[in-house]
Design a protein with these regions (language model features):
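Active-site-proximal loop->helix
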Residues: 19-24, 44-47, 91-103
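Glycine-rich phosphate/pyrophosphate-binding loop and the adjoining helix
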Residues: 127-163
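Alpha-helix C-terminal capping segments
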Residues: 21-24, 70-79, 102, 128
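Glycine-rich phosphate-binding loop
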Residues: 46-84
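Short glycine/serine/threonine-rich phosphate/pyrophosphate-binding segments
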Residues: 11-16, 39-42, 62-71, 90-93, ...
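Active-site rim loops that border cofactor/substrate pockets in soluble metabolic enzymes
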Residues: 24-58, 154
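Short, glycine-/small-residue-rich phosphate/pyrophosphate-handling segment
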Residues: 89-136
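Glycine-rich phosphate/diphosphate-binding loop of Rossmann-like nucleotide-binding domains
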Residues: 1-38
C-alpha cells in the first residue's frame, strides 16, 4: 500500500514532519512538488492516475490560496488530506480556510495549520482500515501516548504532594 504526498513549494519544510511519521509507520510514499496554479495540468493528471498507480491516500500541503488539495480531490476518488501551511500573510488562516471550505462532493480532510504529523497519522489510519499491521502500529502509538501522560501525571502528583 502506498501513499502520495504532493505539495506546493510553500509546504516543503512542513512536509518533512509528515515524511518522518510515514517512515515511523513503514508506509511507502512519494513526494512531488506541484502547484494548483502553476502546474494545474500536471496536478490534475497526477491525481487522476494516483489510484491506478497504487496510491491509497493523497496528502497535499500548500500555503496562501492553498488550492492544491481541492484540485487533487476534484480528479480522484482517493481520500485527500490537506495541510494548510503558514505564510507571511495571515499566519496560515488564508490557507486553512481555502483548504477546509470545499464544495459538496469534493471533500478534503483538513488538519491544523502546519499539522503535517497529524496528516500522516490520519493517512495511516485510513490505510489501516485494510492493513492489520498498520492498525497494530497505531494501537501501539496510542498506548505509548497514554503511558506518557500517566507518567507525567504521576510526576505531577509527586510534586503536588511536596507542596
Amino acid at each position: 500500500m502506498s501513499l502520495l504526498t504532493a505539495f506546493d513549494t510553500t509546504g516543503k519544510s512542513v512536509v518533512s514532519k509528515a515524511v518522518s511519521k510515514l517512515k515511523e509507520f513503514g508506509v511507502e510514499y512519494e513526494v512531488h512538488v506541484m502547484s494548483a496554479h502553476r502546474t494545474p495540468d500536471a496536478a490534475i493528471k497526477f491525481s487522476a492516475e494516483a489510484k491506478k498507480n497504487g496510491f491509497g491516500v493523497i496528502i497535499a500541503a500548500a500555503g496562501m490560496a492553498a488550492h492544491l488539495a481541492g484540485v487533487l480531490a476534484a480528479k480522484t476518488t482517493l481520500p485527500v488530506i490537506g495541510i494548510p501551511c503558514k505564510s507571511a500573510q495571515l499566519d496560515g488562516m488564508d490557507a486553512l480556510l481555502a483548504t477546509v471550505m470545499m464544495p459538496t462532493g469534493i471533500p478534503v480532510a483538513t488538519v491544523a495549520v502546519d499539522g503535517a504529523a497529524n496528516a500522516a497519522i490520519l493517512a495511516v489510519e485510513m490505510l489501516a482500515l485494510s492493513d492489520d499491521s498498520l492498525a497494530e502500529k497505531l494501537e501501539n502509538m496510542k498506548a505509548d501516548m497514554e503511558k506518557g501522560v500517566a507518567e507525567k501525571d504521576k510526576a505531577m502528583q509527586a510534586k503536588v504532594a511536596e507542596l
